[in-house]
Amino acid sequence: TLAEASLQAQQVEVISRMIERNHEEIDDHDLSVIAGLIKQLSSNVAVWLMTEEEKRGEQ
């Protein structure tokens, strides 16, 4: 849903800001885990947007 995609995009933004502010305190392993989370959240948003675009193109 739009609400879910919006929430996931906001989560990516918050996580990214946390990395910017605290990058010196994050070790390589944690950074790898965080990158995986960002990838998952952002890909979910991208898939939703592409699906919606496809639906609108069919109308």
Regions found by a protein language model. Name each.
Residues T1-Q59:
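Sequence/structural signature of long amphipathic alpha-helices
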